[in-house]
């Protein structure tokens, strides 16, 4: 029997809205807010004042487990390099910026010297201006060429919204420069009639990696004049290019560099990143080029008050009678409501599209009870909207018409939202880099700001709100990506060959794994070797071999039955869990029921309904070891890393009451299984170790299962992954290892580097896992430690005390981490000896 937990989209069922919370004793952190300073004379309340008002309700102050004060910082000015055109400097000054910050001037100097550079400074530190000054100067020079297009620049953003926002900024900044600067967006929303003008006349093209992969590079002859003059490539928010998506983007960039070379261009790459560990190395992996880093942030910053907020326990009980906390979704909706009533401009960042819609709906309902004019000032912003809906929301946000917004990470990435007072983050976003990026959206223009992290009821969030040093005393993570992943590299070699025949010198550009893959691609009759190089042999488009976001397949369209109206799309990889038959789907505040999921036609038919429940899919998994790459002894057991094959099937879904989260029932589903070949870390335990840990056969399955759930929950603290990027399986007797085994694997074909990171930091990772379980206040396990909302076995069996004893015994003989003591950016945890349980309440 295998117990498993699969990567999937968030399914944060709406928690208890009206149930009375059970107040519990949470001692106020020693570093809690000092006495409130006097409110400033301006109309904008101080962050401390806003937080005090939020905490004023019954039992609310106990929910704040820690408050961190980041003091204001003064800025350091410099002067622009004299090679920047005076007209550009004048345009910048006309925009109200008299002098650059020191990091802006330094980055511009590198760009003018022809050096690729990454600017890794904080949110709102002016990274855009750092690359725009040299880019606009070069474009203005090029506009004086006989054809008016002597220089061009390409801008890559991870989202359409960011590209559209940047175009507005560039157009405004460059207005005094006349027709010398011609910015244009080229993405899936660009009307067909405008595309030819962009190709022939625009000299600053803003797009995304998806369009570069599918639209621009395969049609490079039509872009020849643009590519021939390409001087700069700007890669904005480059820290988001991690995991499988980042690996794909790295190969798309290598294809771009190859075509530029054929047209005689050698563009300089200008990258903008949030504060990150080793930004130069990460940018080098992404581009394949040496990259200089500018990481000393010289911009000023207002005070940031950062509160950690843990929702209270309720009177309700979950699976197996476990105590249940109020959901982060419901708690965030309350906070957004209160902030809107206070007139505080706020954004609530939510992990899932569904969560964003739920928070918006709840906030609107509650605001209507206060003032009927307020619901219109709150909205949801997420991916999957139609282009016209997305643009309308962006206009409302910029105009100030919207006061509160529930947004997914589509808004996290640098869109210029001025005047925000507060940010509420519903659940840890997976990395410290993303956490600080979201928190930094408030307090622009130097004013003070409030950020609140609301903990979800899971092991990692619970650990973090009670261990603030893991957030505030640790550096941000290194970016993990693997361009040599064969599942990533192979389709890009095919795409490159379709663009221009691949030659032997090209292979160095694509990395050492390219030469090994070519014979396999020939055998598969995808490529054919001729004297001029390797050629693409098929009629279909090579660029369609892969979805660079790692989602696979074509999107599933969500269509309203009866009217035929297209509501939006969902990725094929998420369709089995998000739009299965019977699923509840939210769109723009309306609720729909999925009547049919047609996988062949990639369509989900829905009808509007108002069910009093939400739905959560459940799945089961089997795993087989294909190859063990590395293994090291852990006492009598082994820690291994290698290739596995995972078979997953969505088998049912739960219906939960909206108000209480109570499970109403489970409905079986008949969906086909899906197979994934990927990379995994796994560990085994021997009978002697089980005897030492007092693990008898009756509790073995529950102990392994509990350790697996908790270890998945804690891995994002050690690797730059999200919880749904990884999956796990625990087996009391696995047929390949012939021992009790726990697997944790990458949820992407070919792997994404997360399991490898887990192998490298295994001692620290499993020590933190043990501590998270042992320090939880519950008796037999709860969502804060060992229960998982996605468990295909209904969180049964689980044995909390057995998991602690098992991990204690395993760690007793654990060698130092192969990655070394300095590579893990997670907090130091106590020894896992029986005498040092990490908590006086340890079982």
Could you tell me what each predicted segment is?
Residues 55-95, 99-102, 106, 112-118, ...:
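Helicase motor core with emphasis on the C-terminal RecA-like subdomain
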Residues 12-13:
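Short hydrophobic alpha-helical segments enriched in small aliphatic residues
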Residues 7, 28-77:
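Intrinsically disordered, low-complexity accessory regions that flank the conserved helicase/ATPase core
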Residues 448-451, 457-472, 482, 492-503, ...:
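Extended Lys/Arg-rich polyanion-binding regions
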Residues 818-840:
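Intrinsically disordered, low-complexity proline-rich tandem-repeat tracts
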Residues 807-820:
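Short Fe-S-cluster ligation motifs
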Residues 776, 781-785:
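Short cysteine clusters
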């Amino acid at each position: 029997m295998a117990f498993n937990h699969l990567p999937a989209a968030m399914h944060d069922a709406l928690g208890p809205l009206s149930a009375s919370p059970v107040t519990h004793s949470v001692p106020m952190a020693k570093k809690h807010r000092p006495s409130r300073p006097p409110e400033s004379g301006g109309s904008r309340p101080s962050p401390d004042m806003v937080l005090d008002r939020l905490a004023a309700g019954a039992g609310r102050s106990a929910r704040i487990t820690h408050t961190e004060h980041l003091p204001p910082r003064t800025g350091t000015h410099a002067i622009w390099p004299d090679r920047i055109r005076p007209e550009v400097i004048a345009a910048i000054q006309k925009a109200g910026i008299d002098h650059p910050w020191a990091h802006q001037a330094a980055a511009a100097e590198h760009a003018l010297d022809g050096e690729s550079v990454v600017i890794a400074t904080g949110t709102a530190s002016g990274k855009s201006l750092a690359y725009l000054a040299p880019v606009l100067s070069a474009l203005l020079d090029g506009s004086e060429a006989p054809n008016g297009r002597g220089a061009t620049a390409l801008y890559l953003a991870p989202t359409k919204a960011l590209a559209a926002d940047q175009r507005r900024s560039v157009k405004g900044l460059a207005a005094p420069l006349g027709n010398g600067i011609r910015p244009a967006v080229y993405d899936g929303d660009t009307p067909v009639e405008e595309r030819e003008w962009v190709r022939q006349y625009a000299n600053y093209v803003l797009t995304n990696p998806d369009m570069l992969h599918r639209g621009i590079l395969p049609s490079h002859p039509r872009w020849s004049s643009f590519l021939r003059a390409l001087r700069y490539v700007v890669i904005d928010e480059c820290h988001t290019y991690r995991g499988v998506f980042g690996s794909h983007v790295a190969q798309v960039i290598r294809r771009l560099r190859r075509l530029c070379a054929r047209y005689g261009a050698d563009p300089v790459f200008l990258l903008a990143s949030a504060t990150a560990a080793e930004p130069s190395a990460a940018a080098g992996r992404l581009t394949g080029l040496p990259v200089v880093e500018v990481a000393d942030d010289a911009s000023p910053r207002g005070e940031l008050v950062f509160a950690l907020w843990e929702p209270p326990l309720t009177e309700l009980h979950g699976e197996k009678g476990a105590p249940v906390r109020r959901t982060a979704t419901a708690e965030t909706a309350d906070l957004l409501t209160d902030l809107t009533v206070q007139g505080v401009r706020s954004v609530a960042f939510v992990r899932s599209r569904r969560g964003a819609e739920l928070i918006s709906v709840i906030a609107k309902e509650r605001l209507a009870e206060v003032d009927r004019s307020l619901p219109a000032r709150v909205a949801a912003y997420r991916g999957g909207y139609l282009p016209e809906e997305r643009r309308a929301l962006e206009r409302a946000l910029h105009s100030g018409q919207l006061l509160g917004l529930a947004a997914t990470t589509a808004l996290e990435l640098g869109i210029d939202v001025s005047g925000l007072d507060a940010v509420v983050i519903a659940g840890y976003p997976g990395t410290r880099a993303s956490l600080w990026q979201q928190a930094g959206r408030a307090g622009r223009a130097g004013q003070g700001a409030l950020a609140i992290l609301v903990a979800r009821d899971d092991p990692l969030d619970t650990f973090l709100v009670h261990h603030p040093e893991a957030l505030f005393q640790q550096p941000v993570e290194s970016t993990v990506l693997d361009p040599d992943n064969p599942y990533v590299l192979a389709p890009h070699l095919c795409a490159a060959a379709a663009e221009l025949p691949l030659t032997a010198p090209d292979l160095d550009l694509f990395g050492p794994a390219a030469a090994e893959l070519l014979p396999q691609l020939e055998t598969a009759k995808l490529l054919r070797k001729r004297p001029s190089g390797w050629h693409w042999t098929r009629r279909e488009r090579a660029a369609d071999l892969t979805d660079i976001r790692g989602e696979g397949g074509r999107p599933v369209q969500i269509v309203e039955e009866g009217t035929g109206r297209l509501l939006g799309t969902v990725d094929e990889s998420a369709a089995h869990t998000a739009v299965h038959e019977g699923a509840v789907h939210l769109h723009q505040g309306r609720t729909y029921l999925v009547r049919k999921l047609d996988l062949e036609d990639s369509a989900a038919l829905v009808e509007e309904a108002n069910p009093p429940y939400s739905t959560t899919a459940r799945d089961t998994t089997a795993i087989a070891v294909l190859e063990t790459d590395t293994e090291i002894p852990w006492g009598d057991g082994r820690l291994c890393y290698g290739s596995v094959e995972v078979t997953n099937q969505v088998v049912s879904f739960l219906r939960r009451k909206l108000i209480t989260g109570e499970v109403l029932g489970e409905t079986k589903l008949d969906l086909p299984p899906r197979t994934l070949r990927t990379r995994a870390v796994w560990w085994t335990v021997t009978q002697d170790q089980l005897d030492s840990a007092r693990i008898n056969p009756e509790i073995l399955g529950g102990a392994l299962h509990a350790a697996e759930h908790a270890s998945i929950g804690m891995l994002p603290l050690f690797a730059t992954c999200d919880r749904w990027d990884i999956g796990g399986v625990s087996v009391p007797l696995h047929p390949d290892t012939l021992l009790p085994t726990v697997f944790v694997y990458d949820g992407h074909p070919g792997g994404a580097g997360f399991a490898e990171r887990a192998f490298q930091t295994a001692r620290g990772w499993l020590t933190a896992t043990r501590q998270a379980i042992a320090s939880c206040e519950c008796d037999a396990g709860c969502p804060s430690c060992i229960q998982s909302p996605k468990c295909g076995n209904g969180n049964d069996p689980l044995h909390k005390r057995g998991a602690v004893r098992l991990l204690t015994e395993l760690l007793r003989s654990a060698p130092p981490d192969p990655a070394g003591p300095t590579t893990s950016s997670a907090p130091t945890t106590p020894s896992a000896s029986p005498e040092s349980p990490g908590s006086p309440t340890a079982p």
